Each structure stands twice: as C-alpha cells, then as structure tokens.
Amino acid sequence: MKTPSKIFLVGMPGSGKSTLGKQLAEKLNRNFFDLDAEIERMAGWVIPDIFEQIGEDYFRELENSVLTMLIKLNEPAVIATGGGAPCFFDNMDQMNGAGATIFINTPMDTIIERVKKEKSTRPLVNRMEDDSLAQDMEALYKKRLPHYEKASFTTNSNLQDVVQFLESAKS
C-alpha cells in the first residue's frame, strides 16, 4: 500500500490545520490546498462577507462543492479543511472515502488563544462575545467532536506523529 493520494486535516478553528498542512505537503512533496482559501478564490469574496451577505447555508453549500472538486483533482494533495467542513452534508464520509483524514486535536487553551487574535476573520467565532468565548468554543467542540472522531488518525498537531501514521499506512 502507498501513502493515500489525498490527506485531509480536520479540527477546530485555530487548531493548526493550515500550518501543519503546509509542513506536511512540503515533506511529502505534494500540493497544499486550504479549503477556505479555495472557497474565497472561487467565490471572489472573503468568508466573513459570504456569511454576512449571503448566509451560512450558502457558505456550507459552496464549501461542499469546492471540497468535492478538490477530492476529484487527479493529483496527490494535502487539504486543510475549515473547522465546520466535516460536520455538514456527507463531507466527512467523502473525505474518508477519498484518502486519509487526520483530526488535529489541539488543546482548547491554545485554540482560544489563537482565535482571539484572528477573531474578525472567523465568522462563527466573531459572533461570540469575548467573556463567553471559552465556553462557546467548548460547546462548539463538543458539537463537532463526533464528526472529527470519524477521522483515520488523531494527533495534537505533531508533524512527526502524522508522518509516522502515514508511513504505517504504507505497510
């Protein structure tokens, strides 16, 4: 067996999916795609504007379409998804059927610290009040966890763990 053609990184906003994805793609000599960046490129809008002007339902449909397009690409790739992508439509099943899914299970304290710095670029987080951010993020995590747990592998964002998992998938 060889390394899966597509490797999908899933997890909460601020978990480090994009950072780890870039590192992993470089190590494996593959293209890297950030699902949110691809959505923005194709829509011609930034995600906060899509949420604000058109709504989350439209965004989720667009997200599903772009994810499906990336799955169908005829090239090996590492794909960092948006935090909610695995939780809508049959996205997680699609990803599991197309390659390896890796849940980046970063400690909540680290996630909160990161999203506070980038709150305005994260529509769901931006709606949360600062004094209840930790509680709201914890609730969001609990809601999404059953979807994330369908991943092939879970790590706390350690590149070496991911590489070892992929190496073991080869044998």
What role is predicted for each listed range?
Residues 2-4, 27, 142-171:
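NTP-dependent small-molecule kinase module
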Residues 9:
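Hydrophobic anchor at the beta1->P-loop junction of P-loop NTPases
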Residues 12:
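P-loop (Walker A) phosphate-binding loop of NTP-binding proteins
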Residues 17:
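Conserved lysine of the Walker
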Residues 20:
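Hydrophobic positions on the alpha1 helix immediately C-terminal to the Walker A/P-loop
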Residues 26-37, 45:
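Post-Walker A helix-loop "phosphate-sensing" segment adjacent to the P-loop in P-loop NTPases
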Residues 37-96, 121, 138:
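ATP-dependent small-molecule kinase phosphotransfer cores
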Residues 98-143:
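A glycine- and Lys/Arg-enriched "phosphate-lid" helix/loop adjacent to the NTP-binding pocket
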